[in-house]
Amino acid sequence: MAKDPTFEEVTGCQRALFEWADSYDTKDWERLKKCVAPTLRIDYRSFLDKLWEAMPSDEFILMASDPRFLGNPLLKTQHFVGLSTWQKISPDEIEGTHQLRVPHQRYTDSNMKEVAVKGHAHGIATMWYKRVEDEWKFAGVCPQIRWAEFDYDKVFAEGKDHFGENGGNGEHAV
């Protein structure tokens, strides 16, 4: 059924996309809860070596807010979204492909003056959106990192150990 979504459908998905990105960057987990679908497809194989085909939203929020991942208070991020393409998969599902640049800096302490590690990722991400009770929600992500700057591989090293293929979390992982 792949076809172009309507303007209203795209703007609904853009709203969910903005809420997802900005809640990640501000670490506003209550806000994140409001913009996600009940179940998400999280494909973090590009940096955590893990795919969750059907992760419940509560588990997704716990993972995102974990101090070994984005919940680290010493980690600052900015999820920049560039141009996008949109494809309607079904009446209640849309797939977006978005250009992304995501700088990351982890500081040594709460003074936020000395950077311990920084790494910036550049590429695209396929993201899924679902209509839930007449509102478009963020329903998953698959980042494709084309290149990185600095020590990107070290930014989530602890998270990769915990959430990745050999980690102890993620019963829904593939």
From Swiss-Prot:
Keyword hit for Ion transport: no
Q: Where does substrate bind?
A: Y24, Y44, F47
What Pfam families does the record point to?
Scytalone_dh
Protein EC: 4.2.1.-
Task: Recite the UniProt keywords alphabetically.
Answer: Lyase
Catalytic residues of the enzyme: H79, H104
Pathway noted in the entry: Secondary metabolite biosynthesis
- Membrane-traversing stretches: none
Supply the InterPro entries for this chain: NTF2-like_dom_sf (IPR032710), Scytalone_dehydratase (IPR004235), Scytalone_dh (IPR049884)
Q: How does it assemble?
A: Homotrimer. Each subunit contains an active site, located in the central part of the hydrophobic core of the monomer, which functions independently.
Name of the protein described by the UniProt record: Dehydratase AgnL8
Gene encoding the protein = AgnL8
